[in-house]
Amino acid sequence: MSGSTGERSFADIITSIRYWVIHSITIPSLFIAGWLFVSTGLAYDVFGSPRPNEYFTESRQGIPLITGRFDPLDQLDEFSRSF
């Protein structure tokens, strides 16, 4: 058998009070931060994705669907010009 690395066992860690004091604060905080990030719309701004009301504009009502097998780059250029 190999020697001990000196680390605490997993069972010892999850049964300690210190573990639960730290994680009872950090885990809910992460969920709240994620919810605020999405609900305030900051996620749309950071990642540059369109908001739900911006997918279809007055000038662009069709679905950007590539139908040609041999000229997809031309169709992509046409779609990108409409943005």
From Swiss-Prot:
Belongs to the PsbE/PsbF family. One of its GO terms (molecular function) is heme binding. This b-type cytochrome is tightly associated with the reaction center of photosystem II (PSII). PSII is a light-driven water:plastoquinone oxidoreductase that uses light energy to abstract electrons from H(2)O, generating O(2) and a proton gradient subsequently used for ATP formation. It consists of a core antenna complex that captures photons, and an electron transfer chain that converts photonic excitation into a charge separation. HAMAP family: PSII_PsbE. InterPro entries: PSII_cyt_b559_asu, PSII_cyt_b559_asu_sf, PSII_cyt_b559_CS, PSII_cyt_b559_N, PSII_cytb559_asu_lum. It is found in: Plastid, Chloroplast thylakoid membrane. This is Cytochrome b559 subunit alpha. It comes from Acorus calamus. It comes from the Eukaryota. The chain crosses the membrane at residues 21-35. It holds the Pfam family Cytochrom_B559. Heterodimer of an alpha subunit and a beta subunit. PSII is composed of 1 copy each of membrane proteins PsbA, PsbB, PsbC, PsbD, PsbE, PsbF, PsbH, PsbI, PsbJ, PsbK, PsbL, PsbM, PsbT, PsbX, PsbY, PsbZ, Psb30/Ycf12, at least 3 peripheral proteins of the oxygen-evolving complex and a large number of cofactors. It forms dimeric complexes. Its cofactor is heme b. It is a single-pass membrane protein. With its partner (PsbF) binds heme. PSII binds additional chlorophylls, carotenoids and specific lipids. PROSITE patterns: CYTOCHROME_B559. Its main location: plastid. Keywords: Chloroplast, Electron transport, Heme, Iron, Membrane, Metal-binding, Photosynthesis, Photosystem II, Plastid, Thylakoid, Transmembrane, Transmembrane helix, Transport. SUPFAM superfamilies: Cytochrome b559 subunits. GO terms for cellular component: chloroplast thylakoid membrane; photosystem II reaction center. Coiled coil: none annotated. Heme binds at residue 23. GO terms for biological process: photosynthetic electron transport chain.
